[in-house]
Regions:
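Juxtamembrane intracellular "pre-TM" segments in multi-pass secondary transporters
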Residues: 1-8, 184-212
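Cytoplasmic helix-loop-helix junction between adjacent transmembrane helices
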Residues: 106-144
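A membrane-interface helix-boundary motif in multi-pass transporters
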Residues: 159-171, 349-369
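Helix-to-loop junctions at the C-terminal end of transmembrane segments
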Residues: 61-73, 159, 253-267, 349
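A late C-terminal transmembrane helix in Major Facilitator Superfamily
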Residues: 324-354
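Helix-loop boundary and gating motifs at the non-cytosolic
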Residues: 5-55, 206-212, 216-243
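Structural signature of the two symmetry-related core transmembrane helices
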Residues: 76-90, 269-283
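C-terminal membrane-cytosol helix-exit motif in multi-pass small-molecule transporters
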Residues: 171-189, 375-379
Length: 393
């Protein structure tokens, strides 16, 4: 792909494909717990284990699937990922009376996502100059976020007809798999980093962006996971759904607008803006009414637009590995942060809920938004200043 043209026909097709993949996935994801409970006849603790393993497959395997994509080729990897998505959708469709097929469908879609994400994001920036990367990364994120915003709406319209929903989603996945067969295979560039053995899939890790990404998602996912529960009885379901759609649409509109400015911004400054907005949003939630929740979600959307983009750009700039491997490593960081959010955040939420002081939960999360980033920066600087034992010997 030409280095000087950011939005070629191939890249536009990729962006459209990502939009549709996310519409399909997020028309299913919000309703998975209900679906699994109905088909498996299990309690929510068991359902939580199944969903947790699915999340682990999707995120913890990302460095391995990224290393595989580096060897297999990005176009082939995208086709393979979409075939896995299609098989997962088919398993959901035919597994109404077979819980094992339903669980297999979950794992196939999780595995497909693990392979698709680094391949898609790497293909978008393949052959692009460093000056074009911010626009392409932000456009890729925007397409995904638009799909995330629209997917639950599609799911809500079709959830009463699950067979139809799974048939539509499977048809979308299969059509995309066929379309990606005609995608141009990427050519290896002269300045491409060497392909390293699988055992070195984590070598060349950009440590600071990895750590900041993990912390970002640790605090961010507490908003994403627990606000719906907090909002029950405080605001209407329609208002909450519209507000969360506004969050995703805010990312879609804002991130491409600020991409070049974020790229030029110093990392600590971007962290201050991003985590600062997250803290403001968490504090706003303590108001517990429609205005407070809307303001909080808007602040978090603005902060996320800056912080999440800067994390990826810094990882690309600081690592000597290929973009495919870097995006896989970053996806692992997302999984680490999200898992910590589920464990730590869930216990904290339960503690405050049991004590009848639920707004205090958001103050604790806001305090972490303020305290954790400078702690991460401080530890990173100390590590850089620490003498190397090999040098002193």
């Amino acid at each position: 792909m030409p280095r000087g043209h950011p939005f070629t026909g191939t890249r536009i097709a990729l962006l459209a494909g990502s939009l549709l993949v996310n519409v399909g996935s997020f028309s299913i994801y919000p309703y998975l717990a209900v679906l699994l409970r109905e088909r498996m006849g299990a309690d929510m603790a068991q359902i939580g284990v199944v969903l947790g393993v699915g999340t682990l497959v999707q995120f913890a395997s990302a460095p391995a699937t990224a290393a595989l994509a580096e060897r297999l080729g990005l176009q082939r990897s995208l086709v393979c990922a979409l075939v896995m998505y299609s098989l997962g959708g088919t398993a959901f469709l035919v597994g109404e009376d077979n819980p094992a097929l339903t669980v297999a469908g979950l794992f196939l879609i999780s595995g497909g996502g693990s392979l698709y994400s680094p391949s898609y994001r790497s293909y978008l920036v393949h052959g692009a100059s460093p000056e074009l990367r911010p626009r392409l990364v932000s456009a890729g994120n925007a397409a995904g976020n638009l799909g995330i915003a629209l997917g639950p709406v599609v799911g809500a319209l079709l959830i009463q007809f699950p067979d139809l929903m799974f048939a539509v989603v499977t048809a979308v996945y299969t059509s995309l798999a066929v379309a990606h067969l005609f995608l141009r295979r990427e050519q290896r560039t002269e300045d491409a980093p060497p392909i390293e053995p699988f055992r070195r899939m984590l070598s060349g890790l950009a440590v600071l962006p990895f750590a900041v990404t993990a912390v970002s998602y640790y605090v961010h996912m507490q908003f994403f996971q627990y606000l719906s529960s907090y909002a029950q009885g405080r605001v209407s379901t329609v208002f909450f759904g519209a507000t969360m759609m506004g969050y995703s649409l805010g990312l879609v509109l804002l991130q491409p607008l600020v991409a070049q400015r974020v790229e030029r911004m110093a990392y600590p400054a971007a962290m201050a803006i991003g985590f600062g907005c997250l803290a403001v949003g968490m504090v706003s939630f303590t108001g517990g009414n429609e205005l407070a929740i809307a303001v909080g979600v808007a602040a978090i959307s603005a902060g996320s637009a800056v912080l999440l983009l800067k994390n990826d750009l810094e990882a690309l700039a600081r690592s000597r590995r290929s973009a495919t491997v870097v995006f896989g490593q970053q996806r692992l960081a997302v999984g680490v942060g999200s898992s910590l959010s589920g464990v730590v955040g869930g216990n904290l939420y339960g503690l405050f809920e049991g004590g009848g002081r639920l707004p205090g939960f958001w103050l604790v999360v806001a305090a972490q938004c303020v305290l954790l980033p400078p702690l991460v920066l401080g530890v990173h600087r100390l590590r850089r200043r620490a003498p190397n034992p090999a040098d002193s010997s």
